[in-house]
Amino acid sequence: MIINHNMSSMYANRMLGINNDQVQGNIEKLSSGQRINRAGDDASGLAVSEKMRMQIRGLNQAQKNIQNGVSFIQATEGYLQETTDILGRIRELSIQSANGIYSDEDRMQIQVEVSQLIDEVDRIASSAQFNGMNMLTGAFAANSVSGRIMQFHIGANVDQNARVYIGTMTAQSLGLVGTQGDAFAKLSIASPESANMAIATLDSALTSVNKQRADLGAYQNRFEMAAKGIGIASENLQAAESIIRDTDMASEIVDYTKNQILTQSSVAMLAQANTQAQNVLPLLS
């Protein structure tokens, strides 16, 4: 029997340190709810889960971008609804003026309303804005010379974007006024013949507006479908990231209980090992 080196005590002390570290790790995982709290816990798992987290954040922002896009489209469509109503009213007045029972003076009075409505079409086009940007003056037309585009980033990665094109919806672009801005240059209802020609012009204008509204509806449907897909992708990534990173509480509690018992046993065995040297004393008496 030796007394200078108590190997049993040293072994018990080393195991006590190991078990105590295990308990501390269990407590950290149980209190944080995460299996990986630092790179040392699982280096590869941390790298993969961090990539997933960045992707999830990107998808969540893409969802917001899509919501902004839908709001932009709905605002534009609302202005075009007003334009459609005005064009419908002008067409109604043109049909009225084409009727032979009205005098030239009557048609002049009708023309006054038509001219005011044409001015309103221009007012809507110039005042239709979203976040300070004009929407109906051709800034975002496919053939725009301004060089501006309306682009929405609808994904979490590079080049995952979609463009929205909005044509010019001014009175001149719709054929309601001439190149000099004279409301009577192209749309006059001063006679039954000119009123009849105005009906054809208005039909063409309504076709342009309705096509633009249909395009906006298609854009919105696409965005809404993209939002659903992004939502599903985000959910799946969060589920996968949870499997990698989150704590399995039931399993961790079992491990925590085991390590607590081992720690208590190590403390007891360390106490026993420290008393072994006292067995030498009877030999010396």
UniProtKB/Swiss-Prot annotation:
The keyword Lipid metabolism does not apply. Glycosylated. Glycosylation is not essential for motility. GO terms for molecular function: structural molecule activity. GO terms for cellular component: periplasmic flagellum. It is found in: Periplasmic flagellum; Periplasm. Its main location: periplasm. It comes from the Bacteria. The keyword Glycoprotein applies. InterPro entries: Flagellin, Flagellin_C, Flagellin_C_sub2, Flagellin_N. Coiled coil: none annotated. Keywords: Bacterial flagellum, Glycoprotein, Periplasm. Disulfide bonds: none annotated. The core of the flagellum consists of several antigenically related polypeptides. Component of the core of the flagella. Belongs to the bacterial flagellin family. PANTHER family: FLAGELLIN (PTHR42792:SF2). This is Flagellar filament 30.7 kDa core protein. It comes from Treponema maltophilum.
